[in-house]
Amino acid sequence: MSQSIKQLYGEKLGALDGEIGHVKDFYFDDRSWVVRYVVADTGNWLPGRLVLLSPHAIGSVYQDGKVLLANLTRKQIEDSPAIESHKPVSRQYEAEYYRYYGWPYYWLGDGLWGLSGFPILETPVKPFAGEPANQVAPEPGNPDVHLRSAQAVKGYNLQAGDGAAGHVADFMMNEESWAIDELVIKTGNRFTGKEMRIPSSSVKRISYDDSTVYVNLTKEAVEQSPEHHLASPGAAHAECVIL
C-alpha cells in the first residue's frame, strides 16, 4: 500500500525508551527513487544536529498507534555519528553511519536495499573493531548528490515534453520498501487545479538549479493520469484512493 509522504510530516518519532521528536523531512535517492532516511526534528534534545533514522530502524511505515517507533535507544541515537544540520550527507558519512549500527550498506548489490529488497527491521549489532568506516566511500567530504530532500523538491515545477504541466505536490511511498512509486502533481491553477499521480519512472531528471522536474510525458498524459485523493488524516490508516 502507498503512503502520502506529506501526511507523515509532524508524526511523532519514538525510541525504545521514549520519544525523540517528530518527522521533519525525508531524504530520497533520485536515481532509485527510494527514501533512505527519515529526518527527525528533536527539538531541544540534540540542537544543531541533523538526526537521521534509516528505514532499517523502523521497518514498515505503517505501525499501530500514532508514533513511528525506531528499534533504537535514545542513547544509541545520541551517540551515532553526528552531522551538522546545514551540511550535505556524504557517502563517507553514510558508511560511518551504517557501520556504527552494523547494518548492510544499501549501495552494495542490485536490490533497492542492496542485497535485500526491503529494509528489514534490524537490531543494531556492534561493528567489527578496526574496520575502516570509509572502506567503500569516495573522497572525504564528497556529498552524495543524488540524496535529496522531499520537502525541498515539493513545489518544483513539472516540465513535460511539450511544456509546463504543473508542480510537485506530494510523493507516494510504498509502506514496506520505502520506494517512491508515484509523484503527485498539481495541474493548472495552484488553487483550483486537480492533483494527478504520475509514475516516478517517468522522471528524466531533476534540475536543482531551476527547481524543475523533467518527465518523458506530454501535458495531456499528465492531465489524463489517475486523479489523486486522500482519506481524511484522522482515519486509522490513511488509505490513498485512485479514482
Residue ranges of predicted features:
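Peripheral interaction segments used for macromolecular assembly
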Residues: 1-243
